[in-house]
A protein has these predicted regions:
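Accessory RNA-recognition modules of RNA-modification enzymes
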Residues: 1-190
Length: 190
């Protein structure tokens, strides 16, 4: 997948090149507001990897593909693993294919937002629309098989087997479905 995925484009850069590139992006965004001179030291917040990810899923040639968009394209790269993710998320795209298979009955793609929590994976499916009672039961069974902490559809909880929690400082916080969370623990600590 390296070199094909839009998110991987800069991963091979040395730290100085990466720092200059990222700082340049921030300065360019702030320049129209006259604030680019206020950008100071670069703080690396990569940490041990991304703890949240949104995969894209669609049907292709009779199969389900789940992964990231190819750089400058709408094509989904079928993902087996990604070195930028925390270990808990490494094989999640592949593992979540049965959920996508239940929802992808047409060519309409869906998104699968996944957060690694201390209780297990918190999964929010997006792009499908309301689920019938029968589909909700099938999704619940699949969540059980996959040992998900929680499964929701556009923030509507299908099943919560364990409250998805993360540590923020000394507190253990239960996340609402589909909420924003800093991508890395190191980024949150800032």
């Amino acid at each position: 997948v390296f070199g094909q995925c839009g998110g991987c484009a800069i991963q091979e850069a040395d730290q100085e090149t990466y720092t200059q590139w990222k700082t340049g992006l921030v300065k360019a965004a702030l320049a129209p507001l006259g604030l680019s001179d206020r950008v100071t030291d670069f703080i690396d917040a990569h940490g041990t990897g991304r703890r949240r990810v949104t995969f894209h899923a669609r049907r292709r040639d009779g199969d389900i593909v789940i992964g990231f968009m190819r750089a400058k394209s709408h094509d989904v790269i079928d993902l087996q693993s990604c070195p930028l993710l925390v270990p808990q998320l490494q094989d999640s795209a592949f593992r979540l294919k049965p959920l996508a298979r239940l929802l992808l009955k047409s060519d309409k793609p869906i998104d699968i937002a996944v957060t690694a929590t201390t209780s297990g994976l918190d999964v929010d499916l997006r792009g499908h629309g309301p689920a019938s009672p029968e589909l909700r039961m099938k999704l619940t069974r699949e969540a059980e098989i996959l040992d998900l902490a929680r499964l929701s559809l556009h923030g509507d909880i299908i099943v919560e087997r364990r409250a998805p929690q993360i540590a923020i400082g000394k507190a253990s916080v239960i996340l609402p479905p589909g909420c924003f969370l800093q991508a890395t623990e190191a980024g949150e600590a800032l």
